[in-house]
Amino acid sequence: MKEKPSGHMLLDILGLISSRLMLVVFGLGTGIITARLLGPHDRGLFTVLLLLPQTLVNLAKMGVAQANVFYIRKRGASVATVASNSLVLCITVSVVLLATCYVGRDWFIAPFTKGAAPAYVLLALTAVPFVLIESYFLSILQAVENFRAYNLQSVYKAVFSFVTIAVALLALHGRLWAALLSQMLVTAGANLWLLYQVRQVAPFGLRWDGTVGRGTLEFGAKSYLQTLAAHLHYRIDIYLIAYFLSPIEVAFYSIAVNMTNPILQISDAIGTVIFPKLAGSSDVDAHARTAITCRHTLFATILAAIFYAGVGSQALTILYGDRYAPAIRPMLLMLPGIIMISLYQILTRNFTSRNRQQVNIVAAVLALGVNLSLNVLLIPRFGIAGAALSTAVSYTLAALLLLFVFVRESGATVRGTVVIRATDLASYPRMLAAAGSRLRGARGTAR
């Protein structure tokens, strides 16, 4: 595929960050409404039940999203073929996963959903096929660099989540069931729209291409362990808090996570845009792009973390109310880990783009083991503060391990990878001017 110039890439990044900022605003609005109207106990259950389909999908999605990008960008696979295979996999995996959940519900679902009615758990599980669609088909938009539709899907989902939650809990005086139902409907609607958008790019159907399918699953098997370990690393603390403590503590911790999530949108947006470019580059170019991206991403993330350290405590109590003040301490303890997550997110894209997922897998599994061990030791003793500390330590370990391997393989230096340069800062006005010029050109064309 033809490479886009740097001004266009910056425009993609700024567009994605802008859409993520909208997600943050509406996400905070949704979080504030649910926190204030559901109360800590039901807010905690709401968090676990919404997270459940995400985790189940990560257990079963087989790394197909990363493989879709790799095969379209690196192997030149037909977008329609990849999309058709993805649809077949969505249906097959959903059926198998839901059947497994039904059979094993007392073993691996009930221990983490204590206090939730079985009907609520069943309602949450209806999101599984739509979460799979989101994973597989967003990756196709990412591969073809259609970031406009990619961004709109997320924005629509956030806006309608806020609106439906407001209607369910304010206008209809609903409780937990109404909040859950509203989110399931939004998830379904947003991802049916996503299918329509991909079909506009490349018409697809319910058919299977064995050659592309086998290659996708072989590549995905490597990414699968990486993404599964990464998801569990990021979310297992919620489940362990639910297991060891109570839904109320889950609510406090989830509020702390929600408050710091806006910082992670920086590295996530940049990583999303840079990944297809890395996948289409030579190793030398990929290493150079990665080092530059790491410097800019860390710089922006550190500035955001410093800002949070100064105003985060006051903002949390103003937004969520004084009864959520116990979330302040874990929020502050998370900040060093958030900085290291940003480095981790960029470096994993480099290794995946070069079909070196084994490096990511080793780092993710090692960090997951450390995180799990520390959580089991610290949560019973220190509560949710122990969970925040565990995450900070384990992500620091994972990021440093990836950095060590990246430096060895690329020939870059640690300083050249993580410390912002004067020339980097000097490039901002030029890149912004180029992005602005392209934006004005796009508007002129639209007219």
In which residue ranges do the predicted regions lie?
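Membrane-interface junctions at transmembrane-helix termini in multi-pass inner-membrane proteins
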Residues: 6, 71-74, 130-155, 336-363
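Hydrophobic alpha-helical transmembrane segments
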Residues: 118, 122, 151-200, 366-370, ...
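Interfacial segments at transmembrane-helix termini and the short loops linking adjacent helices
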Residues: 41, 105-124, 310-339
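Membrane-water interface segments that mark the loop-to-transmembrane alpha-helix transition
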Residues: 11-23, 49, 58-106, 115, ...
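Signature of the first transmembrane helix
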Residues: 7-65, 94, 102, 162, ...
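Helix-loop junctions and terminal segments of transmembrane helices
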Residues: 27, 60-77, 143, 256, ...
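Transmembrane helix-bundle signature of multi-pass secondary active exporters and lipid flippases
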Residues: 50-58, 253-275, 300-304, 334-341
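Interhelical loop/hinge segments that connect adjacent transmembrane helices in multipass membrane
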Residues: 1-5, 9, 148, 152, ...
